[in-house]
Amino acid sequence: MLAAKNILNRSSLSSSFRIATRLQSTKVQGSVIGIDLGTTNSAVAIMEGKVPKIIENAEGSRTTPSVVAFTKEGERLVGIPAKRQAVVNPENTLFATKRLIGRRFEDAEVQRDIKQVPYKIVKHSNGDAWVEARGQTYSPAQIGGFVLNKMKETAEAYLGKPVKNAVVTVPAYFNDSQRQATKDAGQIVGLNVLRVVNEPTAAALAYGLEKSDSKVVAVFDLGGGTFDISILDIDNGVFEVKSTNGDTHLGGEDFDIYLLREIVSRFKTETGIDLENDRMAIQRIREAAEKAKIELSSTVSTEINLPFITADASGPKHINMKFSRAQFETLTAPLVKRTVDPVKKALKDAGLSTSDISEVLLVGGMSRMPKVVETVKSLFGKDPSKAVNPDEAVAIGAAVQGAVLSGEVTDVLLLDVTPLSLGIETLGGVFTRLIPRNTTIPTKKSQIFSTAAAGQTSVEIRVFQGERELVRDNKLIGNFTLAGIPPAPKGVPQIEVTFDIDADGIINVSARDKATNKDSSITVAGSSGLSENEIEQMVNDAEKFKSQDEARKQAIETANKADQLANDTENSLKEFEGKVDKAEAQKVRDQITSLKELVARVQGGEEVNAEELKTKTEELQTSSMKLFEQLYKNDSNNNNNNNNGNNAESDETKQ
């Protein structure tokens, strides 16, 4: 455990800085493709001169389903061929696996997905959620890799040459582990992922490439599996993200599931047959639900016809149901409502009101839903822009960023942000922030800390992510130990802790003992990170418990100071024992004992009266000052008496 020790505030060390170099300074050789690795569909684009182009796949489509299937013949299918055979091979057809990237098997979202997909989600030996097909287990990153490879092959077929470098997009609210897993997916198939770019930021790049005027743009990105809202300031080629928010488990897949459940429920009511465990039937209904959802964006009603969905003793059963747009909107209203709070929080974090927003861009297939468009219009007080293609903007933006990295496009600077605050645990379980949420990245920040006990030769650095004042209310994302610190009194060693976040949002934390230059570090990439509920809860709780957290933090900090005062006073009493008034010394000892008991209660997590702690600290401070002032006076008087005696002897000698 570390004891926070801001030595003269260490402003030169603890100020963060933005690496705002023009990105073309790190040029790469050859073409850099841009890939939108989506939950439902993926796309690939390339820059041709100054014009970005979406590349059609082998089937002639501009987007490719993010679906991977394994046939009984041992063949692996990706994209449209995989999706076509899903009904006859549901348990070996993997889709929406992006939602599993970087997640632990025990995560609530994973447990929910287990009940909603026909394939097996299993627990890997490291605790992560993996998938199983044909008796073989795969990491979600591997499945993502197969889709990335399909995008790579699509680009190579068009360009007529091998492709090695890519920019891949991720949801803005992806945590460190999910970003790292996305880079791993590229590496698996031999792609050098030069940059991981947030999806709404990429869409803004696509929108603002040829625009020189200054605008504040909101990107509302509701895709197949995730929702992001980002506020950007676009000014003459500089794209600066002001804030971001979102939900990593909200998208078109959820709308499909809501409609699927309604169909299954109606069918059960009509026939008494529960289709929930019939994987083939559920897959047919899932595909029909997706198709109906899409149709209801352009028509006011649709019909779902699925003949021979099942059979019982009386014969075959069919599904024949009608759904109106109004019914679908009522059914999915809770999902649409979940987009509202993140928008409000993003505006608040950016310090802006809706009147400050120049344009609202709609991105992601679900943003076509009329109710979503209506909600966005209501939130921002203006019609959203149709300047970008919701399905293609992200891949185009990734291609723009790729062209920046290769030097084909100049004078474009992208400044993104980290979505949640980062810091470490300090004495008393306090969350000490080093990098606040919505800090522009890349960024680096250092701060000096010290030991919490005398003779401490190692410290454990525990890295947390969140918005609460105490670590117990935030998310542990990594920890490591710095050993080999020379034994010294409590608070003497100077340990410099540095957070370094790269342009991909991946975190490196290091600690260095300034006396010996020994250091230790960790790249925070092994944890499964935060669920969307945890992120939303963190921000809500941070507001709800702000005063309570602040009071608790103040109590801990006061207790730490009180403990230091008690120890210092106790040591001084021992040093000057016999030179101070015994009664006064005992009074001070009693105050030390009383104060230490109160401090122990605070450090044990007990709620104590902050005023009582403050009063007892001040009383000890006053008593100890009086005692040692008297000691100083006594010493001064003794010195004066000695000097007078010496002067008298000197006078006698002269006579």
UniProtKB/Swiss-Prot annotation:
The reactions it catalyses are:
ATP + H2O = ADP + phosphate + H(+)
Its chief place of residence is mitochondrion
State how it assembles: Component of the PAM complex, at least composed of SSC1 (mtHsp70), MGE1, TIM44, PAM16/TIM16, PAM17 and PAM18/TIM14. In the complex, SSC1 interacts directly with PAM18 and TIM44. Interacts with NAP1. Component of endonuclease SceI (endo.SceI), which is a heterodimer of ENS2 and SSC1.
EC number in record: 3.6.4.10
- The PTM Phosphothreonine maps to 330
What is the originating organism of this protein?
Answer: Saccharomyces cerevisiae (Baker's yeast)
Taxonomic lineage from the root:
Eukaryota, Fungi, Dikarya, Ascomycota, Saccharomycotina
The record's similarity note reads: Belongs to the heat shock protein 70 family.
The enzyme class is hydrolase
Q: Which domain of life is it from?
A: Eukaryota
Q: Where in the cell is it found?
A: Mitochondrion matrix
What ranges does the record give for the region Disordered, renumbered to this chain?
Answer: 629-655
* Protein name according to UniProt: Import motor subunit, mitochondrial
Q: Could you confirm whether the keyword Transport appears in this record? A: no
Gene3D superfamilies, per database record: 1.20.1270.10, 3.30.420.40, Actin, Chain A, domain 4 (3.90.640.10), Substrate Binding Domain Of DNAk, Chain A, domain 1 (2.60.34.10)
Q: Keyword annotations for this protein?
A: ATP-binding, Chaperone, Hydrolase, Mitochondrion, Nucleotide-binding, Phosphoprotein, Stress response, Transit peptide
Transit peptide (residue range): 1-23
**Which GO molecular-function terms appear in the entry?**
ATP binding; ATP-dependent protein folding chaperone; hydrolase activity; unfolded protein binding
Q: Which InterPro entries match?
A: ATPase_NBD, Chaperone_DnaK, Heat_shock_70_CS, HSP70_C_sf, HSP70_peptide-bd_sf, Hsp_70_fam
* Residue stretches of biased makeup (Low complexity): 637-647
What are its GO cellular component terms? cytosol; mitochondrial inner membrane; mitochondrial intermembrane space; mitochondrial matrix
Q: So what does this one do?
A: Essential component of the PAM complex, a complex required for the translocation of transit peptide-containing proteins from the inner membrane into the mitochondrial matrix in an ATP-dependent manner. Constitutes the ATP-driven core of the motor and binds the precursor preprotein. Required for the import of the processed frataxin homolog YFH1 into the mitochondrion.
Q: Has the keyword Transit peptide been applied to this entry?
A: yes
